[in-house]
Swiss-Prot record:
Na(+) binds at E40, G45, S441. PROSITE patterns: COX1, COX1_CUB. CDD domains: Cyt_c_Oxidase_I (cd01663). Belongs to the heme-copper respiratory oxidase family. This is Cytochrome c oxidase subunit 1. It is a multi-pass membrane protein. GO terms for biological process: electron transport coupled proton transport; mitochondrial electron transport, cytochrome c to oxygen. The chain crosses the membrane at residues 12-40, 51-86, 95-117, 141-170, 183-212, 228-261, 270-286, 299-327, 336-357, 371-400, 407-433, 447-478. Cu cation binds at H240, H290, H291. Signal peptide: none annotated. It comes from Mammuthus primigenius. It catalyses: 4 Fe(II)-[cytochrome c] + O2 + 8 H(+)(in) = 4 Fe(III)-[cytochrome c] + 2 H2O + 4 H(+)(out). The keyword Nucleotide-binding does not apply. Pathway: Energy metabolism; oxidative phosphorylation.
Length: 515
């Protein structure tokens, strides 16, 4: 029965499908917000007519894309679908908790949308800094609704993380060691640990903000002995691991895609890849204050955070060069998924280089809160995370659905998207270097040309998103079934057929140990 299958589901494949559908839907909402932002900035002068509304749209765009698009698709969608198949587990360790993790998200999303509709909305930016987020500058229920929304999304992610950690550590076949696991499994494991350690700190910070707003506490109010900088420390101690949470599953997916379409049976430097991910996860926790170079820290503090941030480039470089080495000498198949993966490597590297620039505290003091920062993190998110999601989706779509996408359309869609995102975000580096600040709805005429180009790019990206919806419809309408899958010996998720039966590995997988 429909309700029993989808509302009360305890099946990792069905829950993964729910996550993918929810993430796609939220992605449309987030894209709509971003189009509104670029429409406002397409030329000087006012379009929306109100800076508060503009800032509400910017805030909503960030929250929707991070908490309701990237995380549900990467961790909830691909994670749920692939982890049990890749380690030969019959399902997740806690199947009912898995269901709850998903069903906490729609109410959370609803609360976020509600927060935009009451009073004047939450126009604080996704960081929700006090005193702007306090009860004077943002009177009314809006910020409180946003905080509740974050609480629900946070609980969902924490439960999900516990579930993945338990599944990966406990539900492998006895002969399978940690170092026999596919890289995507490793990436989700590291991501889950990051979630488990960082989200409680965010919960503490926003709960204190909630009591500051409603119960007259003064955690972040200097008038009562508090300090708004404390909030920034708490937020960014979560916020920096969060950006690695958004990209690490992408690393895992790209490793699989690059290996598969290079015709290799394993990625180059498996152990290096694993340790690089663990290093990135660890280092991600000790660099948070590089988001706060402008709040007046001591010079030695800034020196430490600059150096520590730059160290992250080393394991990241290990991954990039290992992907290139995996490609080397391979029998390369130019499938759409491979194109997304190669686009990921190229554009993520550019985003990483601008990150190294921003790691220098002296430079960051000039570039902080300019469009240079926006360009940097959209290169790693809008062209890192999103390209990985697109590549993973196209690569594993036959596994999820049993049908194949039209490769010609998929390549056209990649090309349109590639042009669109680059035209959107490359000019923003120039705007930032010229000093155009973030989070303003208008700008001096001198910035017009690059902003117009950027807005043109965003509309091209919108065409690519619509093309993707068309491609998915076309695949289900044409019903081209998968005939044969190559390289299944080293890509075990395909072993049960396309799509796999509702229940897989009902008796444990037999793994022969080579160690």
């Amino acid at each position: 029965m429909f309700a029993n299958r989808w509302l009360y589901s305890t099946n990792h494949k069905d829950i993964g499908t729910l996550y993918l559908l929810f993430g796609a839907w939220a992605g449309m909402v987030g894209t709509a917000f971003s189009i509104l932002i670029r429409a406002e900035l397409g030329q000087p002068g006012s379009l929306l007519g109100d800076d508060q509304i503009y800032n509400v749209i910017v805030t909503a765009h960030a929250f929707v894309m991070i908490f309701f698009m990237v995380m549900p698709i990467m961790i909830g969608g691909f994670g749920n679908w692939l982890i049990p198949l890749m380690i030969g587990a019959p399902d997740m360790a806690f199947p009912r908790m898995n269901n709850m993790s998903f069903w906490l998200l729609p109410p959370s999303f609803l609360l976020l949308l509600a927060s935009s509709m009451v009073e004047a909305g939450t126009g604080t930016g996704w960081t929700v800094y006090p005193p702007l987020a306090g009860n004077l500058a943002h009177a009314g229920a809006s910020v409180d609704l946003t905080i509740f929304s974050l609480h629900l999304a946070g609980v969902s992610s924490i439960l999900s993380a516990i579930n993945f950690i338990t599944t990966i550590i406990n539900m492998k076949p006895p002969a399978m060691s940690q170092y026999h696991m596919p890289l995507f499994v490793w990436s989700i494991l590291v991501t889950a640990v990051l979630l488990l350690l960082s989200l409680p700190v965010l919960a503490a910070g926003i709960t204190m903000l909630l009591t500051d707003r409603n119960l007259n506490t003064t955690f972040f109010d200097p008038a009562g002995g508090g300090d708004p900088i404390l909030y920034q420390h708490l937020f960014w101690f979560f916020g920096h691991p969060e950006v690695y949470i958004l990209i690490l599953p992408g690393f895992g997916m790209v490793s699989h895609i690059v290996t598969y379409y290079s015709g290799k049976k394993e990625p180059f430097g498996y152990m290096g890849m694993v340790w690089a991910m663990m290093s990135i996860g660890f280092l991600g926790f000790i660099v948070w204050a590089h988001h706060m170079f402008t709040v007046g820290m001591d010079v030695d503090t800034r020196a430490y955070f600059t150096s520590a941030t730059m160290i992250i480039a080393i394991p990241t470089g290990v991954k990039v060069f290992s992907w290139l080495a995996t490609l080397h000498g391979g029998n390369i198949k130019w499938s759409p998924a491979m194109m997304w993966a190669l686009g990921f490597i190229f554009l993520f590297t550019i985003g990483g280089l601008t990150g190294i620039v921003l790691a220098n505290s002296s430079l960051d003091i000039v570039l902080h809160d300019t469009y240079y920062v926006v360009a940097h993190f959209h290169y790693v998110l809008s062209m890192g995370a999103v390209f990985a999601i697109m590549g993973g989706f196209i690569h594993w779509f036959p596994l999820f659905s049993g049908y194949t996408l039209n490769h010609t359309w998929a390549k056209i869609q990649f090309l349109v998207m590639f042009i669109g995102v680059n035209l959107t975000f490359f000019p923003q580096h120039f705007l930032g270097l010229s000093g155009m600040p973030r989070r303003y709805s208008d700008y001096p005429d001198a910035y017009t040309a690059w902003n117009t180009a950027s807005s043109m790019g965003s509309f091209i990206s919108l065409v690519a998103v619509i093309l993707m919806v068309f491609m998915i419809w076309e695949a289900f309408a044409s019903k081209r079934e998968v005939s044969v899958m190559e390289l299944t010996t080293t890509n075990v998720e395909w072993l049960n057929g396309c799509p796999p039966p509702h229940h897989t590995f009902e008796e444990p997988a037999y793994v022969k140990s080579n160690s």
